[in-house]
Regions:
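Interdomain linker/hinge connecting the two RecA-like lobes of the SF2 helicase core
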Residues: 1-80, 84-96, 188-189, 194-200
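Short, solvent-exposed loop/turn segments at secondary-structure junctions
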Residues: 42, 86-90, 108, 133-134, ...
Length: 200
């Protein structure tokens, strides 16, 4: 705390060119639309589950969540970034989503780089992968639609994955779908709590 108080005595923080009279063009972000879809109920169950119970809930709803993701992506001509956390989710998503390319951790580096470059160039309609593989560092302003087929407890992974498309240079509103089972409500609440802590 003392360090930050000392820093505040002489520093100025500028988070946008508008703060010092410049135009915002190029540094403005489009609208971010986040929609939650609960595949097996109307309301998330907010009770705290053990890690084992949460894993079982994800396994139990895997087919429903993947089919819902496929319904959304297959009814669109636009590019889609499909995020998952489990290998079984990845395989099922690739199976049910038309024109999808799957990038797994066990893939050869050539496949990973060719797939990510192909997605960047618009040659791949749907890229199925994990935030731990492609959630950091990629610039995909060419895409403005993504689906999370479930969530992990990591706010950082969620934030970084969304920021692959929601970044400076993005010309269209970014649509983020979060597809979860009712029993995963506590995971989403945990992410939201971490986000609120981050923004304080």
């Amino acid at each position: 705390d003392v360090f930050w108080q000392w820093l505040a005595t002489f520093s100025v923080f500028i988070d946008n060119p508008v703060n010092i009279g410049y135009k915002v063009a190029g540094y403005d972000l489009p609208q971010l639309n986040i929609q939650e879809i609960i595949v097996d109920g109307n309301e998330p169950i907010k009770e705290t589950l053990t890690l084992t119970e949460r894993r079982q809930a994800r396994k139990d709803s895997l087919t429903l969540r993947c089919e819902k993701a496929a319904e959304i992506a297959n009814n669109s001509d636009e590019q889609w970034l499909i995020w998952c956390d489990l290998n079984d989710e990845s395989a099922k998503l690739h199976e049910v989503i038309n024109d999808s390319v799957e990038v797994k951790g066990s893939d050869k580096p050539e496949h990973k780089s060719n797939s990510m470059i192909g997605f960047s160039e618009g040659k791949i309609k749907c890229l199925v992968t994990k935030p731990s593989i492609a959630g950091f560092g990629m610039n995909w302003q060419n895409c403005h639609n993504m689906i999370f087929t479930g969530l992990s407890d990591s706010y950082e992974q969620f934030y970084q994955a969304v920021r692959r498309c929601y970044r400076f240079g993005q010309k269209k509103p970014v649509n983020v779908y979060i597809i979860i089972s009712a029993k995963e409500g506590c995971v989403k609440e945990n992410i939201e709590r971490k986000q609120a802590d981050f923004l304080k």
